[in-house]
Design a protein with these regions (language model features):
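Active-site substrate-recognition segment that forms the wall
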Residues: 18-25, 47-54, 61-87, 117-122, ...
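Dinucleotide-binding Rossmann-like beta1-alpha1 core, especially the glycine-rich loop
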Residues: 48-161, 320-321
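Helix-loop-beta segment of a Rossmann-like dinucleotide-binding subdomain
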Residues: 90-91, 118-134, 140-201, 298-302, ...
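Helical element adjacent to the flavin cofactor pocket in flavoenzyme catalytic cores
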Residues: 176-235, 243
Length: 412
């Protein structure tokens, strides 16, 4: 027998750290175990808080939408007729989660700074502008506008109106969509702030430590195994990101999370050039606090490969230069790739598994981990300690996938 605690969290990305913070604030003894594997999702994030944009496919989700339209065109089908099941408009329950989570950030940024001294660089942005290049994209924006409630303000802009907001945008566009209330943080500092604030409240961490499996007895998860060591826990929270499914499988559980590679390009610092975050069918573009321009992100099902490829980087750069031509003269500071935890319906997997005690999911946020982290952390903490949920968790439970809990028989 090794360590023992009330709650073990496996995985130290922004979700894991945020859950640790919420539990530690509730004075729950918590131990977070993290291997810091290459390619965790936080490293693939732009730090854009784009709740409505992501929920309707106008954030980096529009890249998926463009791919679908291109595939239809190649197949001889009308690219304007995008099937409902294949568009980027996600369920209203998820949009509501993202909007509510985003609304927590202004107070949360101050709270974290006061608690642990880390500034997450929360910045009220000029919104999210989606540049419209052709009629297919214009028609998609019209569908999005019709699908949104009045509380989610989307303004369709003429080219002239767009250039007044963003003078550096290409003259190739035929219009744009503006989503207000979309902001930015530094993703790495946000994760670090959650971690340090959790420590202030009493959470413990084990770094560079790989959990090799879950220990299950009958219908209960007893704790985690670290090689020959066993750490007992009343509850294990699986926040292992792209590795969530692999960890769950060690206890005979099926949690359908898979890795999705996202390649990122970061430019050298520029004087303030962009007033808003930009999204196009080729990339998204966000100028960070210190002037660097972040260009992302590919969406690739390539397993756990975190390689940066010429094709991926070239595609992102071409998309960025098309949108903002002056970027062709800017040097590249860094390129990298991260693995985001994807699910087939693009919704996170949260909460308990029916028939299994002592186990909770906290994964699958895919492109929205940063913006969703505050509220996901609250929901998972509430699930752990038996509090009432801030919002319904049912749309995010694993049982929506059908056969979920008993992929193989657990040990008796």
């Amino acid at each position: 027998m090794g360590d023992k605690t009330d709650v073990v969290i496996v995985g130290g990305g922004v979700i894991g750290f945020a859950v640790a913070y919420e539990l530690a604030r509730r004075r729950v003894p918590v131990l977070l175990i993290d291997k810091d594997l290459p390619g965790r999702a936080t490293s693939a994030s732009a730090g854009g808080l784009w709740p409505v944009g992501e929920a309707v496919g106008l954030g980096c989700g529009v890249i998926y939408q463009a791919t679908q339209a291109a595939a239809r065109k190649q197949a001889g089908l009308d690219p304007l007729e995008v099937e409902e099941s294949h568009d980027g408009i996600l369920p209203a329950a998820f949009r509501d989660l993202l909007v509510a989570s985003n609304a927590l950030y202004p107070d949360l940024s101050s709270e974290l700074l006061e608690t642990c001294g880390v500034d997450i660089e929360f910045r009220l942005g000029g919104g999210l502008i989606f540049a419209v290049y052709d009629e297919a994209e214009r028609k998609y924006v019209e569908r999005v506008t019709a699908a949104l409630p009045d509380s989610c303000r989307l303004e369709q802009l003429t080219p002239e109106e767009t250039w007044r907001i963003e003078p550096m945008l290409t003259r190739e566009l035929i219009g744009a969509a503006l989503l207000a209330g979309e902001h930015q943080v530094n993703p790495m500092l946000t994760a670090e702030a959650f971690k340090r604030a959790a420590i202030v409240h009493g959470a413990r961490f084990r770094h560079d430590t790989r959990v090799t499996g879950l220990r299950r007895q009958g219908d209960r998860i007893l704790g985690v195994e670290i090689g020959d060591e066993f750490v007992a826990a009343g509850t294990v929270i699986n926040a292992a990101g792209a590795w969530t499914g692999e960890l769950a499988a060690t206890a005979g559980l099926s949690v359908p999370v898979f890795p999705v590679r996202g390649q990122i390009v970061l430019s050298q610092a520029l004087p303030r050039t962009l007033n808003a975050c930009l999204s196009t069918s080729g990339c998204y573009i966000a100028q960070k606090l210190h002037g660097e321009v972040l260009i992302g992100s590919t969406t690739e099902r390539v397993g756990f490969d975190v390689s940066v490829t010429p094709e991926g980087v070239s595609g992102l750069c071409k998309g960025a230069v098309r949108a903002v031509p002056l970027l062709q003269h800017v040097g590249i500071k860094r390129v990298w790739a991260g693995l985001r935890p994807g699910t087939e319906d693009e919704l996170p997997i949260l909460g308990p598994v029916p028939g299994i005690e002592g186990y909770i999911n906290a994964s699958g946020a895919f492109r929205t981990g940063i913006v969703a982290a505050p509220l996901i952390a609250r929901l998972v903490a509430q699930s752990t300690v038996g509090e009432a949920y801030d919002m319904p968790i049912e749309p995010f439970l694993v049982e929506r996938f059908g056969e979920h809990a008993l992929a193989t028989a657990g040990p008796s």
